[in-house]
Amino acid sequence: MITVYSKNNCPYCVQAKNLLQLKGIVFEEVKIDEDSEAREFVLGEGHRTVPQIYQAGKLLVAGGFQGLQKQPEEFFQQLKG
């Protein structure tokens, strides 16, 4: 499962979620401004910005939305399984 760590009022988070939806990728969203454990996880991983996109507890792509949009189509096909 893909997890998008995001915040309210975050335009890059919206763009990342929209791109994943456009590519047909199923994901869950966790808002770190509403979930203190998730916030501590993201900070503990050394991240200071959102979105952060994880798969099975590991960082899927560095750079948030900007890193995600640079991925080739094959990347998204693999995520679909």
Stretches found by the model and what they are:
Residues 1-25:
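Local sequence-structure signature of Cys/Sec-based thiol-disulfide redox active-site neighborhoods
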Residues 18-20, 44, 68-69:
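Short, glycine/charged-enriched secondary-structure capping and boundary segments
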Residues 55-81:
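Non-catalytic, surface beta->alpha helical segment in thiol-disulfide oxidoreductase systems
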Residues 45-53:
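Structural micro-motif
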Residues 37-41, 71:
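Short acidic active-site motifs
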